């Protein structure tokens, strides 16, 4: 019927691939990540022709992690394109990561010809069922006429309420159907006009809850403001700064909340975390969940009498945690309303308030202890010596500050304590799920989202290995990314087994946690025209950082670490 319409109209024909690309471009998509192949290669090419930059990866997992991080960094859904069947399955890594972190992302996969479903078609899979645990909303365009509405729906649902992943299924037969160019435009306009605007509207804030929150903070003796990546996603930094500085309340960021207010701010309680959460009597938690990262908001880490004020865009999250007060709303909007309410009747703890002094004194004490350790130049490297050198180099870049990507066990844990974030959305790490393998995908997303910033990845050798082949992607697109690999020869280090542990018929095999000693990771990127460095001393590392930061070209710095440095499972030894 579509072909007959085209014949009558006389206008050029548009196939399903082109209509998907047109709809994506009209919906504001300007970047896509993915791996092409049957049946979506033409779709990628048509999108590029319409002005959408397509970043082609080697593996859908890394591409999916890139799409999820791009959604977080830009506030617009990151789009992942995959082939059918196994390509869609590989894409679930990124989709599930987006769901866990509440980041907007759209997974688009080709699928089997509908006439062959159930007969063992090429890469056949019930992909709608496969994505269900991780997708807020899924659509299948069963006819070319349904493509525009399906595209707009998955885009809108990705950002609606609590952001997350959505899925669009494109059967191969639909991608080859055609309509006239005029009909394609009519379908797109119809889909645009039919968008549910209420879906993407921010929730209305209950003003009485704002008043109650201010009263709780006003009466508190030891208040604390906690904010996370939800506040970063909402661009709440200006409101948070005004709120903190007008009230004098100390603040504690979650790992990816770091930088919303500078780690060097006088009211930052990061270095006094245990004291801050253990003694506060009222905690305003903005865009952060009381999950394992926050010890579930329970004793003994938190006081049994603490009163939580939870600010979250998702009512279900507040209902789950049962705080003293919950405010459903966009983090930026809520914080600004809190500040306005306080501004009309101000209060401030002041620099000499006992609670503020206690936090500052503990911060000073703990920072001094850390600096003593950082001042030691230990060779062979432990984790602290190279981390201090990296910290100083990153701070030396100035503004705009580099985006830091951090993954690993000990590498990420030590980096969280040592590396300093001074600007919003400049730290990406394993996140809510503690996902390993995100590093190179995150680097690529950061470089594409913020081309004016240097991207610096500080990776354990295990974390790097998940996505190491994507250094070719860095080189192919000439992205300003410096990857620093902490090479200690294994998942947590080299072979640390006692002799009495090495038994059984395969005792000559390497330990399950160990890699090839002295692996030349820096040579990998040289195969693709990038620059590699080997650094085993402070001077070698300083020189490599200075040169690579100045060049802003794809680089891998292989930092050799004592295989016995660090602890198994990092700070989560009790879980292993």
What are these regions (language model features)?
Residues 108, 116-123, 274-277, 318-319, ...:
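Thiamine diphosphate
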Residues 52, 103, 249, 306, ...:
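A structural micro-motif
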Residues 170-173, 228-230, 407-410, 559-562:
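Short, well-ordered beta-to-alpha junction loops that form the rim of enzyme active sites
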Residues 20, 27, 35-38, 43-45, ...:
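Active-site diphosphate/adenylate-binding microenvironment
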Residues 167, 310, 405, 458-459:
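Generic enzyme active-site microenvironment
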Residues 2-11, 145, 192-196, 215, ...:
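Phosphate/pyrophosphate-binding active-site segments
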